[in-house]
Amino acid sequence: MTKSELIERIVTHQGLLSSKDVELAIKTMLEQMSQCLATGDRIEIRGFGSFSLHYRAPRVGRNPKTGQSVELEGKFVPHFKPGKELRDRVNEEEHEHP
């Protein structure tokens, strides 16, 4: 599902807000979450999951075109850990719709 599809689905199911209002709310939420992660903060949404940063150590990679070894710097990458309620719900849905 894309962001546009999510916006459409929310507008269709709730009917009180316009498409522009839902789009603004989602864009604002995602921007605030991005800013929190960029400053190293952790985000926890109870029942859904948590977002944090994990450090990837420097390593030697390989250029796929040339096969040449390349030194890759260490970096932080976003990580999502689903909450128990989300995991349980996904597993219920999985059994209902294989």
Curated annotation (Swiss-Prot):
Heterodimer of an alpha and a beta chain. Belongs to the bacterial histone-like protein family. SUPFAM superfamilies: IHF-like DNA-binding proteins (SSF47729). SMART domains: BHL. PROSITE patterns: HISTONE_LIKE. The keyword Transcription applies. HAMAP family: IHF_beta. One of its GO terms (molecular function) is DNA binding. It comes from the Bacteria. NCBIfam families: hip, PRK00199.1. Keywords: DNA recombination, DNA-binding, Transcription, Transcription regulation, Translation regulation. CDD domains: IHF_B. GO terms for cellular component: chromosome; cytosol. This is Integration host factor subunit beta. The keyword Repeat does not apply. The gene is ihfB. This protein is one of the two subunits of integration host factor, a specific DNA-binding protein that functions in genetic recombination as well as in transcriptional and translational control. GO terms for biological process: DNA recombination; regulation of DNA-templated transcription; regulation of translation.
